[in-house]
């Protein structure tokens, strides 16, 4: 995934944009410390931008509707449940949104644990029992209280930094080797373009490989959020909710937010790139109290 993660499209766009800037300005030829600083600046920019804009992006992607005042009994129950769980987790109550979707799903996002958003699909409200929905909400509240969105940003930023840094070190060596026999005065532009092509190619390749790290973290935070939900509302409720997800439609949420959903795309053709563990593994972990 994220698919290759809530972040990857923005991160990739930012990295490629800055790759062009660095190649044109010649920053790649500066000291290794300067390159590391610039790599850190550019590497974290995409992640931080994604985090800051996460609520806006999420609401736009699912066409969510913020619930400020309940219009029916279900919305009243939803607000009360989230308020009570927020108090137990000692966080400010997140904004609440409902979005139209056939699949049973929910997600949490936001730049700060006390300024978060929890969105619930209509499929969840229509197909889950109240106790199951309560467990899913507790799972999302746990993501918020654990600061998973912030941690994910830091992980992605560090990964991006090393992807840019290592790509440019290798690109500098390769482009120098390939252009060593050229006329220095006539081939400067070609050398710069060659460096840009090599570094861009390596950033894409290393970026995909580095997503294994972010996806590993994403899978483990799901286990811990399940365990935290079980502690908050009871293990049986969380297991029942996960079993209910087995009958859900394939998640329709966009790739930019699927990593933050309770019901993710765990059936990736390569498990290393999956943002969520399989439902069977999550249920077994709860039964074994592995992360509790």
Curated annotation (Swiss-Prot):
Family of this protein: Belongs to the peptidase M48B family.
Annotated Zn(2+) binding lies at: 139, 143, 222
Gene field: htpX
Where does the record say this protein resides? Answer: Cell membrane
Q: Which UniProt keywords apply?
A: Cell membrane, Hydrolase, Membrane, Metal-binding, Metalloprotease, Protease, Transmembrane, Transmembrane helix, Zinc
Q: Which cofactor does it need?
A: Zn(2+)
Gene Ontology molecular function: metalloendopeptidase activity; zinc ion binding
The superkingdom of the source organism is Bacteria
Catalytic residues identified in the record: 140
Pull one GO CC term from this UniProt entry.
Answer: plasma membrane
The molecule here is called: Protease HtpX
Cofactor binding annotation? Binds 1 zinc ion per subunit.
The EC number(s) given in the record are 3.4.24.-
Q: What InterPro entries does this protein's entry cite?
A: HtpX_protease, Pept_M48_protease_HtpX, Peptidase_M48
Q: Which PANTHER family match?
A: PROTEASE HTPX (PTHR43221:SF1)
Entry's Gene Ontology BP terms:
proteolysis
- What membrane topology term does the record carry? Multi-pass membrane protein
Query: Do the record's keywords include Protease?
Result: yes
Q: Which Gene3D superfamilies match?
A: Metalloproteases ('zincins'), catalytic domain
Pfam families listed in its UniProt record: Peptidase_M48
Q: What is its main location?
A: membrane
* Annotated source species: Buchnera aphidicola subsp. Schizaphis graminum (strain Sg)
TM region positions: 4-24, 32-52, 150-170, 193-213
């Amino acid at each position: 995934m994220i698919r290759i993660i809530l972040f990857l499209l923005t991160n990739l766009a930012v990295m490629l944009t800055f790759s062009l800037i660095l190649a044109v300005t010649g920053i790649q030829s500066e000291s290794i410390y300067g390159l590391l600083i610039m790599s850190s600046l550019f590497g974290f920019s995409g992640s931080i931008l994604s985090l800051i804009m996460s609520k806006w992006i999420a609401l736009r992607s699912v066409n969510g509707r913020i619930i400020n005042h309940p219009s029916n009994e279900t919305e009243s129950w939803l607000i009360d449940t989230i308020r009570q769980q927020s108090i137990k987790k000692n966080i400010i109550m997140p904004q609440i949104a409902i979005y139209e979707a056939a699949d049973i799903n929910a997600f949490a996002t936001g730049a700060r644990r006390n300024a978060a958003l929890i969105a619930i699909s209509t499929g969840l409200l229509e197909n889950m029992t109240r106790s199951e929905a309560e467990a899913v909400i507790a799972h999302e509240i746990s993501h918020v209280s654990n600061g998973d969105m912030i941690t994910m940003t830091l992980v992605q930023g560090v990964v991006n930094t090393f992807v840019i840094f290592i790509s440019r070190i290798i690109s500098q060596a390769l482009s120098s080797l390939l252009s060593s026999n050229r006329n220095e005065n006539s081939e400067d532009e070609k050398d710069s373009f060659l460096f840009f092509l090599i570094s861009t190619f390596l950033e894409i390749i290393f970026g995909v490989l580095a997503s294994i790290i972010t996806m590993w973290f994403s899978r483990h935070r799901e286990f811990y959020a399940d365990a935290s939900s079980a502690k908050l509302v009871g293990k049986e409720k969380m297991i029942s909710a996960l079993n209910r997800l087995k009958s859900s439609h394939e998640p329709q949420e966009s790739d930019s937010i699927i990593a933050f959903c309770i019901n993710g795309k765990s059936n990736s053709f390569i498990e290393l790139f999956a943002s969520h563990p399989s439902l069977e593994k999550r249920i077994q972990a709860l039964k074994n109290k592995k992360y509790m």
